[in-house]
Amino acid sequence: QRQMCIRDRPYFIDSTNFYDGYWQTSKYFKPFREELLEIFSPSDIILKKVFDWRKSIDSSNTVAVHIRRGDYLNNINRNSLKGGNVIGDVDYYLSAIKIIKEKVKNPLFCFFSDDITWCKDTFSNKLDNSLFVENTGSDAALVDLFSISFCEHGIMSPSTFSWWGNWLRKDKNGSIVVAPKGEYSNEYFLEKSWLII
């Protein structure tokens, strides 16, 4: 793959080749979605941790809000996001939340982030129907990834982690996913059903 988030022409594949690239478009593997969902199923340990936080809530309208900050906070990574930057852009997230509220009855906004303290400080006084999920331990990223996929709806940050969490959602019927406009919002990276704002 020559350019990130853009699908190249298909090449002949044989077992002696090694392929290197970002592969950040489902156009490469959409025909194998069911197979991939089976391959990328969480282990029993991860699944238990996902359900541990979910069983404490009484909502079938969970919305995963993924906010990536971490490495995007330094100027080099922040400036590499061409055509838009939503890192820490509270307005983007509030707009996405407003859209979800208009379309989903009684949504519960479940925040996942590598900076959950910032999320609490920023959003806890703006929403009364929110949950800040703090997974810890060496498997926290996997628990977050599958937790995002088990939520009924999603609000993405511009990251492949966010993309995979939403793409791995098994039941997509009626699922609403909001994604930010920018470098990643091209016809290859985002699914056609996702809302771009």
Language-model features, listed with the residues they occupy:
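Non-catalytic N-terminal targeting/anchoring module and adjacent flexible stem/linker
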Residues: 1, 8, 178-179, 197
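Short, conserved active-site loop motifs that form the nucleotide-linked donor/cofactor pocket
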Residues: 2, 129-131, 194
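Secretory-pathway luminal glycosyltransferase catalytic domains
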Residues: 3, 7-104
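Short aromatic-enriched loop/helix-cap "lid" or pocket-rim segments at secondary-structure transitions
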Residues: 76-79, 123, 189-191
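Donor-binding and catalytic core of enzymes assembling or modifying cell-surface/extracellular glycoconjugates
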Residues: 98-187
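Leloir-type glycosyltransferase catalytic cores
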Residues: 183-197
